């Protein structure tokens, strides 16, 4: 779910715009987030047999903190969900050759996701994520091959990217650039640890070994 339509469509544009350092938040920050969850948090949370991450806040800090954190978490999802839905609408629009407008595509995507999630629960999410990831890997690999051939070979693409310093990962040695680089990295790396989407996948594992190893492998 993390590496969905908004990631596939958004990250290439950010890479072209600002290079490798411009995508430190996602996928680098997101990947390290999963590794940290698997190494330090998944086992302890799994043993608590909670339903939501907010349940942990209630047990640890009380009802008021639970409600406040729940509201903050819901608000934090607005931008991410909006990006997912918008990108999904764009995918339908492109695949249909413009026959399906972006708003209609967004509606189709939302209704489809709500339907299989409501009726299938986390099992349906796991199955569809598995299938979608296979499609993404195969599809992006084919796109890379065809695009490279159209550009005259992969070496031409790499040469062009290198000439524009797109493979530069670290920021310029200025306070502004370094601060923004670190802020972007920790937004996903640390900010997504206490979130419901990560938590529910940990709690849905069939064993503590799967709960701890899965995020590390995924990261």
Language-model segments: which ranges?
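Helix-loop-helix module between adjacent transmembrane segments
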Residues: 21-118, 183-191
């Amino acid at each position: 779910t993390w590496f969905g339509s908004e990631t596939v469509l958004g990250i290439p544009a950010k890479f072209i715009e600002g290079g490798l350092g411009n995508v430190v938040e996602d996928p680098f920050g997101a990947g390290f987030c999963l590794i940290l969850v698997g190494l330090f948090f998944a086992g302890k949370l799994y043993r608590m047999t909670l339903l939501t991450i907010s349940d942990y806040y209630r047990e640890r800090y009380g009802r008021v903190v639970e409600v406040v954190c729940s509201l903050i978490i819901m608000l934090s999802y607005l931008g991410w969900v909006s990006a997912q839905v918008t990108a999904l609408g764009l995918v339908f629009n492109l695949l249909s050759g413009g026959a399906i407008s972006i708003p209609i595509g967004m509606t189709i995507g939302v209704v489809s996701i709500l339907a299989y999630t409501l009726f299938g629960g986390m099992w349906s999410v796991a199955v569809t994520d598995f299938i979608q990831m296979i499609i993404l890997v195969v599809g992006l690999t084919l796109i890379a091959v065809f695009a490279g051939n159209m550009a005259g070979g992969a070496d031409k693409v790499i040469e062009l990217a290198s000439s524009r310093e797109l493979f530069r990962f670290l920021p310029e040695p200025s306070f502004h650039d370094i601060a923004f680089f670190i802020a972007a990295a920790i937004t996903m790396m640390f900010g997504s640890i206490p979130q419901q989407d990560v938590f529910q996948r940990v709690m849905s594992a069939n064993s503590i070994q799967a709960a701890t190893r899965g995020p590390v492998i995924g990261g």
